[in-house]
Design a protein with these regions (language model features):
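ATP/nucleotide-binding catalytic cores
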Residues: 2-169
Length: 169
């Protein structure tokens, strides 16, 4: 399994993850954000590129690897492979960061839902956001109001090209 998808794996050619989207996530009143997209790997790769270029703290959780920094591949959170341990770490961590989760549907059950509700309602976790990325993000009953939803539709049409030093479609 590829732990850190690269931006070269992009099939859409579209840049979705921009500093404006990052700011929208950081400034969101909700601590839980869902990005609904059919291109989850591309979105994760673009978050990685943003983290590398800007130095922002963006982390990615995978079941087989736990929480890992997208900015520095070698930085991992020990003991975070289980979803509940990762959520506890996020709840207790004093560090700012955006935590990305994909393929999380099977983990949306107790005790994880309790931890997610705690994170969503807590004001002490300000600056730490959990972002679910994928096309099948169905939150348990009553949790939809705790999540800010962002939709990403891949643009169909001409691929961008460079003209006079600017990208145009």
């Amino acid at each position: 399994m590829q732990i850190h998808p690269t931006i070269n794996a992009s099939t859409t050619g579209e840049v979705f993850v921009t500093p404006a989207l990052f700011d929208r996530i950081v400034q969101s009143a909700q601590n839980l954000v869902a990005i609904r997209t059919a291109n989850a790997e591309d979105v994760i790769a673009q978050f990685r590129l943003l983290a590398l270029r800007t130095g922002q703290s963006v982390y990615y959780w995978q079941e087989d690897a736990g929480i890992a920094s997208l900015r520095d591949r070698d930085v991992r959170v020990p003991g975070s492979k289980r979803a509940s341990d990762a959520l506890r770490y996020i709840l207790q961590s004093p560090q700012f960061g955006i935590y990305l989760f994909t393929d999380f549907a099977e983990h949306l059950r107790p005790p994880n839902t309790g931890l997610l509700r705690q994170i969503a309602r807590s004001r002490s976790v300000a600056g730490r956001k959990i972002v679910f990325v994928g096309d099948a993000i169905e939150m348990p009953e009553g949790m939809d109001v705790l999540v800010e939803a962002i939709s990403h539709q891949a643009a169909d049409g001409a691929r961008p090209r460079l003209r006079d030093g600017r990208w145009v479609v």
